[in-house]
Amino acid sequence: KPREAELFLIPETSKIGIQVYYQTSYFDIIFDQKDVAFIQDAFSKYLQDFDQKKLIRKKSQKTRRMYGAKGKCRVEWGTIKSMMNNYGDTNYHLGYEFKDNSPYFTIIVKDAKNIATDLGSNVSEKSVEIQLYFTKAQVKTLLDNFSRERLQTEYSALTGSDTYSSDEY
């Protein structure tokens, strides 16, 4: 079922995220700059394979992890956008899958153990696995929005600073 997703930038950490409503909850999937570069590279490889007609039609773990299985991200979730108190760190993998003879680029975010332990006893233990599917046009739009130039422009507008990068320690 098609869903709307929003991209956002966290200026304090230079991280970006995707927010989506999925299975009765809102989820923020947050990536650091290294993972943004990893996703950009995977998007580019997918578009190249798509254009060269190298995509494999048979669904398998291989195609679902074709462009990487070692990504790390933060997931925050809750039933109301303004109250996403649950969070955890997890892995994601990048690939593609055919649905009704059409290929979709996929970001599969594994379930995350909830590390917000101070919220009481009525708290979800973990998030659900999130499967995001993108058409070729959506992949191109995401590539444009993930571009360093676009992120620099957004970062400058939010902070007044010309340097989009985080401190390394």
Could you say what each language-model-derived stretch is?
Residues 1-169:
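Positively charged, low-complexity terminal tracts
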